[in-house]
Amino acid sequence: MAKGNKIPLTFHTYQDAATGTEVVRLTPPDVICHRNYFYQKCFFNDGSKLLFGAAFDGPWNYYLLDLKEQNATQLTEGKGDNTFGGFLSPNDDALYYVKNTRNLMRVDLTTLEEKTIYQVPDDWVGYGTWVANSDCTKMVGIEIKKEDWKPLTDWKKFQEFYFTNPCCRLIRVDLVTGEAETILQENQWLGHPIYRPGDDNTVAFCHEGPHDLVDARMWFINEDGTNMRKVKEHAEGESCTHEFWVPDGSAMIYVSYLKDDTNRYIRSIDPVTLEDRQLRVMPPCSHLMSNYDGTLLVGDGSDAPVDVQDDGGYKIENDPFLYVFNLKTGKEHRIAQHNTSWEVLEGDRQVTHPHPSFTPDNKQVLFTSDVDGKPALYLAKVPDSVWN
């Protein structure tokens, strides 16, 4: 198979056994299919098409699912696609993704013509998820010195990599000219670079590694490399994770948890004043994502975290549910079970993670699960009770 190939899909609809919520499985359970990273754009603006990664052709490539026609068009081919970091352009005309840890690619969604926007220098490796600004004219990413890089194919290697203090740099790439500039370079594992929506001068990034060992995870820096500031000082025994910008740029939301405390806390940072406040207590969700203005949040219940060193202080019962939190009403809703295994699969630590997010109309939640076999894509309906 090759780019442009169309794959017919048969959707499977069922009622969740615990909540009665309508859930639709979009992809077959005998082929690895997964969504992109939860804060990267995956839906067309009108919700009609969905970007995802899949192994229909052997390698993991990008596909575009037409939800009305129930078919998927292959967008990329060959080995080496980072099928988590890719995203759709604001006007739905292109896919951007990184191939072979080196080439930043743009795929025209009409012609499927592909071109290289930027190439990582030979002595560096492109790492993680790269994120564009709101206008999609530039992108921030992380590069790691090639001599320091090791593939992080399981959580043990993830933890070990932290202690190597790899040489990392936060870069900015002009998506028109392909020119790159270094914003920050440190002998410290850096990750999660994200432009603040609507504010190109504010770039967030993190100190990566086991959450209980990282001194301060979240940082802001100006786009020109000035005014680097610590977003918050961790409390004693506190871990912070899975930070994201509310899509309207009003706040950065993150998950906080404490040693010997089974609760999780949804917290919010003001991007200007750095005021840190607790929004609510929640069940043990791993990832969170919001709707456009941050009034609704969705999270995936999880087991004890694997990305800590001292796991003895973080034991919890596995929670298999998806939760929606209405911050206006203060109510919490269990909408459906994801029942995923969270297992590492084919050397990938993320492919079985639900990574839930809302559809553009906020009426459904997209997530990944391997409950029926291999990882597949699902849509769970947001019940009317969430709005009341």
Swiss-Prot record:
EC number, as in UniProt: 4.2.2.6
Tell me the superkingdom of the source: Bacteria
| Reactions the enzyme catalyzes | 4-(4-deoxy-alpha-D-galact-4-enuronosyl)-D-galacturonate = 2 5-dehydro-4-deoxy-D-glucuronate
* A GO MF term: oligogalacturonide lyase activity
Organism per entry: Pectobacterium atrosepticum (strain SCRI 1043 / ATCC BAA-672) (Erwinia carotovora subsp. atroseptica)
Q: Which UniProt keywords apply?
A: Lyase, Periplasm
Q: Where in the cell is it found?
A: Periplasm
- Provide the protein name: Oligogalacturonide lyase
Gene that codes for this? ogl
GO terms in the biological process aspect are: pectin catabolic process
